[in-house]
UniProtKB/Swiss-Prot annotation:
GO terms for cellular component: cytoplasm. Residues 63-224 form the CP-type G domain. Its EC number is 3.6.1.-. It is an enzyme of class 3 (hydrolase). The gene is rsgA. This is Small ribosomal subunit biogenesis GTPase RsgA. Zn(2+) binds at C248, C253, H255, C261.
Amino acid sequence: MEKGRIIRSLSGYYDIETDKGKIQRTRARGEFRKSGQKPIVGDFVDFESENDDGLIWKIYPRINALVRPPIANIDIAVIVTALKEPNFAANLLDRQLVALEAAHVKPVIYFSKADLLTDEAYAAITIIAEDYRQIGYTVLLPASNNNVVARQALQSLLDGRVSVFMGQTGAGKSTLLNQLSPKLGLETGIVSKALSRGKHTTRQVTLIKVNDALIADTPGFSSYEVFDFSAEALDDYFPEFVAVRDGCRFRGCLHLNEPACAVKEAVSLGAIPESRYNSYKAFYELIKSQKPKYKTDNRNF
């Protein structure tokens, strides 16, 4: 029996890499399907080799996991956020941050396409970047004329860790990965001018070795499209709200219409950016309007 990490999943096959660098193609035992378990990229597993194909016998408990894309045991998630083509959208970035907070994955914000901004627009985004740093997030904003320093800082964050890249389609995920390691030869997405959206270029979830890092480039990242928690739990995923909410007069304050709300006071004083509070209110209403999810009961009657 050997232990390794799943680095690729495709059509029912799982490629596993061991600590010694051996790569073994495997399938999962039927018992996993019967118990509702399914191996995903990033899983640590026990497996046996049988001729060309191996068999997965055990999946170790996960530290964290995402559903869309299916990947587990992530150290950091790099949110590649375009500043132009497509234009920067604070609401989208906040939605991605909330999804990662809920999944217990550490976010890193990387602003792309800074070279397309005017001097005035770049100055404005510098202030926004600092707002996110004050919340506690790691933010990388490349210089307006090149991104070499920001790329080097990103590489140092990636080394020795498992990372996933996410962001709006066309934000430049594959372009950034190619810059980090040109030998990858990942196909770069072409932005559709008619739709102002990028064409998907990555077709499978794969962990790729880049220097001392394992990086996942994924076929569409949509874990942030649906909130799988209650509206009452939303403030748990806004770190700056968590930092001050004990000062609210009422326990369970929703930070909307309640008097003596420490969060609203922090917003009025400028300690919490108004854009973040607006995102919170929008997400709260969105969650409230979502249809309840019902889990399927698989018992036989």
